[in-house]
């Protein structure tokens, strides 16, 4: 072939040279492992063998072989060929001539430009061909066998306490989100939520929640606002997936999913020994010398590695794949950075769990890859992998905003030209235009920035935030712990003033409302040293920013309740819930207008049964709702007299005509009794303040010289002007702490009500005895000797009370044992009364209140009746439970009381205070005052109707008496505490 002919076919010669180089390399490296997805094409006897990635043009190959045979000795190698149709050759030739490029194979083409040497370029990214997942259900479970090859540990073991350290976890702003389990009814159109609290689930900080901690890959810690059922504590609770260890054909042990896994589900934590860079290199050489084939090093952060070679858990058996179904992610748990394996897609039960080692896993020498995926790179680990492959995770690539994230990993891994260590990723990112930051991408950027240890990645991420001008995006950055994350980045790169200026510019653009987030992040203490760092631009920017922040106000936030971690979770019972509802109904004022009742679910429509109507003859359909027509104006009430309705007001006005305007309010009640009660309470409080020493203030005050105050002496001697009853009350208050000291020791031996009554009795007895024998010199204080006597007397008194109580309980038990054989006697006592007390049996209904809900006055009068005749020694008769009778036909509701404020105090505290000894005696007086008066007599009958039927008078009169009785029974429960 002439030289001129070779010159005319220069473009073909370049393509053939590259093709021959690939063929020669594949033939010479016969000992190299067969690459998955590509090496199979080099087998001549394989039906699937296709020389398409290697030779694209048969004529070019033949031309090149002829030129080589004329200049060199003939080679015994037989070139691989591929048959093409003439139409395909013509189309490819035309395409190459038009574009100036020639396709070589594997997506690589030769680009020809005038005056420039030929360049190799990748025309398109190699997409992974989807294929059905391979299942390994037939392999046996080898978990126990595999666990014998290493030491199983639960958590990472750190070489020192500073290893794996990261910024402290931030508090979560989420609240509890309880979701009830829905039970399907027989009808598909009706759903009833479960009323059992045990069937509800707390979905707080779950996958579908807007939890800031979960979005930024931070686990909630300890006292979380979500409660003990927080869904964002997977590492701490070791919520591992159900997996098993299997023994593969070429890859050794592997992990198999025993159940279906959803995307992003936590599978296992990668644990081991956390070491720094020095021990990492030593162990690599040591394991290589020991003949350990598999390596288990994972990069935790810059200069820190997790070694699971000899210590770890089942996560170490997760193999490598170039097309993985799992990924490795790093989470902040407390003050440590931890690594976990997560599902990247939906994984079927029986699939092998694999992830890409090129991101964080390292080994001494390159090893052949047996993943069998179409996009397999051929090797795992070693220097070649470290130089050629990208070391960035998919999350970091997405956070950087690179458009072609799918093709980047393959393009960098297959790059023919070598790059310097650590520079190829940065150069590639610089060559790609990142996307603009939107509101949905803030989460990925802040999560990557939280764990970023590389300066160039931090600069790229900060640049995306800095270039954004959308106010909603900035608000989202602040919400995603923006101040805390930027504070950590500022402390990390404070020596680089360019990065510091970048962060300060972002902080200056943040919305400024309150100082709360600024104070919580403690970023001011980090910026303060920058005001004198030496760089004029940084100093000016930091000073202005601190001045702007100092003008902001601190917004008040309700502090979060601190939970006791040792406290048991309260269990809710449906019976307690019913009692609480009845309590609420009793406390709630009754409305005069009827409210619409809740309609129960109706059955199938009548048309579905051919118009026959309901099968049940008792089912008459829903009752029609009748709302009360035109209620009375405020302040007016209705009553009946001889079958006629008249209207009256609280002031005493009566009329037969229905009023249309609100009634004038009555004059306020006399204040004498109220003022007297208030004054007694005020005096008791003032006396208690005089006797209680003031606590030391937390804020130190300037000491002032003490001056003699004559008023202090007069105030101390003021008790001499009190009456004897008032002095006794003061002395009783003085004895109260010492009596209570003894009472507390007997609170588990005696009933609560008896204990209170005994304490009051012993206090009365001590006060009367000391005043009778003139042992009281100052009722506001007692000496140590008197204190010991009081405690000794109280102890003897309560010892006797306990002995009598135990004897009474013993007799009661013996009596019940004797009468146990006769059930009829227990069911119907002789005379219709119970054995324990003389009160008749009363039937209780579900809506009746218990003893604890009765009024204060009723309980106190009952207590006085039980304690009559024995005030110095404990009573042997047990207190019976107070019950209300339920009438068969309840009377109509009464008119409201004259004083509406009295009804609000029905449920006041029932506790007996030692500073109010005469509360029981005063209760009856107040109850008598609070009894409502019956309605005023009706006005004169109208002129048009002077006759009133006599038959209706008796009936209406009976109903009218029912109003008074009902109102009196309601008002009788008001005690002195409620009126005050």
UniProtKB/Swiss-Prot annotation:
User: Where is this chain compositionally biased, Basic residues type?
Assistant: 616-626
What this protein is reported to do is described as:
Histone methyltransferase that trimethylates histone H3 'Lys-36' forming H3K36me3. Involved in transcription elongation as well as in transcription repression.
Q: Where is the composition biased (Low complexity)?
A: 61-78, 870-882
Residues covered by region (Disordered): 21-133, 562-636, 652-675, 689-724, 767-787, 803-980
One protein family per Pfam: SET
Q: Where in the cell is it found?
A: Nucleus; Chromosome
Q: Where is the WW domain?
A: 630-661
Output compositional bias ranges, type Basic and acidic residues: 80-97, 576-587, 710-724, 772-787, 811-822
* Protein name from the UniProt record: Histone-lysine N-methyltransferase, H3 lysine-36 specific
GO MF annotation terms: histone H3K36 methyltransferase activity; histone H3K36 trimethyltransferase activity
Please list the residue ranges annotated as the AWS domain: 167-239
């Amino acid at each position: 072939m002439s030289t001129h002919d070779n010159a005319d076919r220069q473009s073909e010669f370049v393509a053939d040279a590259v093709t021959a180089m690939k063929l020669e390399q594949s033939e010479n490296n016969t000992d190299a492992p067969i690459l998955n997805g590509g090496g199979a094409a080099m087998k001549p006897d394989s039906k699937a063998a296709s020389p398409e990635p290697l030779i694209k043009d048969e004529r070019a190959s033949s031309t090149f072989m002829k030129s080589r045979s004329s200049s060199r000795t003939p080679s015994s190698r037989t070139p691989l060929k591929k048959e093409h149709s003439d139409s395909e050759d013509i189309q490819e030739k035309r395409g190459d001539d038009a574009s100036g490029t020639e396709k070589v194979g594997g997506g690589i083409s030769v680009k020809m430009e005038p005056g420039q040497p030929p360049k190799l370029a990748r025309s398109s990214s190699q997409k992974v061909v989807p294929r059905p997942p391979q299942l390994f259900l037939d392999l046996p479970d080898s978990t126990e066998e595999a666990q014998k090859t290493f030491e199983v540990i639960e958590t990472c073991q750190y070489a020192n306490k500073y290893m794996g350290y990261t910024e402290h976890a931030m508090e979560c702003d989420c609240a509890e989100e309880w979701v009830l389990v829905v039970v399907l009814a027989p009808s598909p159109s009706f759903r009833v939520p479960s009323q059992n609290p045990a069937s509800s689930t707390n979905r707080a900080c779950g996958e579908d929640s807007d939890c800031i901690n979960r979005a930024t890959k931070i686990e909630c810690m300890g006292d979380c606002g979500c409660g003990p059922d927080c869904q964002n504590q997977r590492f701490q609770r070791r919520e591992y997936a159900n997996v098993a260890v299997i023994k593969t054909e070429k890859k050794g042990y592997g992990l198999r999913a025993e159940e279906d896994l959803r995307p992003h589900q936590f599978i296992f934590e990668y644990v081991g020994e956390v070491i720094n860079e020095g021990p990492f290199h030593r162990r690599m050489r040591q394991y290589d010398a020991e003949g350990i084939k598999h390596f288990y090093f994972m990069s935790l952060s810059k200069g820190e590695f997790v070694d699971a070679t000899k210590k770890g858990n089942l996560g170490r058996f997760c193999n490598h794949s170039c097309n993985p179904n799992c990924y490795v992610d790093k989470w902040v748990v407390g003050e440590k950075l931890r690594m976990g394996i997560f599902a990247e897609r939906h994984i079927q039960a029986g699939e092998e769990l694999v992830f890409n080692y090129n991101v964080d896993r390292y080994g001494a020498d390159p090893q052949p890859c047996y993943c069998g995926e179409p996009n397999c790179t051929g090797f795992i680990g070693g220097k070649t992998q470290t130089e050629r492959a990208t070391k960035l995770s998919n999350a970091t690539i997405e956070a950087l905003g690179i458009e072609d994230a799918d093709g980047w990993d393959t393009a960098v891994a297959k790059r023919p030209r070598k790059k310097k260590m650590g520079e190829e990723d940065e150069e590639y990112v610089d060559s790609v235009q990142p996307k603009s930051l939107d509101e949905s991408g803030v989460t990925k950027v802040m999560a990557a920035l939280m764990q970023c240890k590389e300066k160039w990645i931090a600069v790229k991420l900060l640049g995306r935030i800095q270039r954004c001008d959308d106010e909603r995006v900035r608000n989202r950055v602040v919400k995603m712990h923006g101040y805390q994350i930027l504070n950590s980045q500022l402390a990390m790169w404070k020596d680089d003033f360019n990065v510091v200026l970048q962060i300060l510019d972002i902080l200056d653009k943040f919305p400024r409302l309150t100082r709360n987030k600024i104070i919580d992040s403690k970023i001011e203490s980090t910026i303060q040293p920058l005001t004198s760092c030496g760089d004029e631009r940084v100093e000016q920017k930091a000073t202005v920013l601190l001045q702007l922040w100092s003008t902001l106000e601190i917004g008040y936030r309700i502090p979060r309740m601190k939970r006791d971690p040792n406290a048991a979770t309260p269990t809710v019972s449906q019976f307690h819930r019913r009692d609480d509802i009845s309590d609420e109904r009793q406390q709630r004022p009754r409305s005069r207008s009827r409210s619409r009742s809740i309609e129960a679910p109706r059955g199938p429509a009548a048309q579905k049964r051919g118009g026959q109507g309901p099968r049940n003859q008792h089912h008459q359909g829903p009752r029609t709702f009748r709302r009360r027509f035109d209620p009375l104006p405020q302040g007016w009430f209705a009553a009946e007299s001889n079958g006629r309705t008249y209207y009256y007001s609280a002031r005493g006005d009566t009329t037969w005509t229905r009023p249309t305007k609100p009634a004038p309010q009555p004059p306020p009640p006399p204040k004498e009794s109220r003022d007297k009660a208030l004054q007694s309470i005020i005096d008791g409080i003032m006396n208690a303040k005089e006797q209680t020493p003031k606590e030391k203030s937390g804020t130190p005050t300037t000491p002032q010289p003490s001056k003699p105050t004559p008023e202090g002496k007069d105030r101390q001697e003021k008790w001499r002007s009190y009456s004897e009853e008032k002095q006794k009350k003061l002395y009783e208050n003085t004895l109260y702490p010492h009596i209570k000291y003894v009472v507390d020791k007997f609170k588990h031996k005696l009933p609560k009500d008896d204990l209170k009554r005994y304490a009051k009795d012993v206090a009365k007895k001590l006060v009367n005895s000391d005043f009778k024998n003139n042992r009281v010199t100052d009722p506001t204080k007692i000496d140590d000797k008197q204190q010991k006597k009081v405690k000794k007397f109280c102890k003897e008194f309560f010892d006797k009370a306990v002995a009598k109580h135990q004897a009474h309980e013993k007799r009661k038990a013996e009596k019940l044992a004797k009468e146990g054989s006769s059930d009829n006697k227990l069911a119907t006592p002789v005379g219709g009364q119970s054995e324990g007390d003389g009160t008749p049996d009363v039937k209780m209904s579900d809506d009746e209140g218990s003893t604890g809900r009765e009024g204060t006055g009723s309980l106190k009068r009952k207590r006085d009746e039980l304690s009559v005749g024995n005030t110095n020694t404990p009573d042997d008769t047990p207190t019976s439970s107070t019950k209300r009778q339920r009438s068969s036909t309840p009377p109509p509701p009464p008119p409201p009381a004259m004083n509406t404020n009295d009804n609000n105090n029905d449920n006041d505290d029932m506790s007996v205070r030692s500073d109010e000894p005469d509360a029981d005696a005063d209760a009856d007086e107040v109850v008598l005052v609070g009894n409502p008066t019956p309605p005023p007599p009706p006005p004169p009958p109208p002129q048009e109707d002077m006759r009133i039927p006599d038959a209706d008078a008796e009936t209406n009169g009976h109903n009218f008496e029912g109003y008074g009785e009902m109102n009196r029974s309601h008002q009788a429960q008001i005690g002195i505490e409620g009126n005050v």
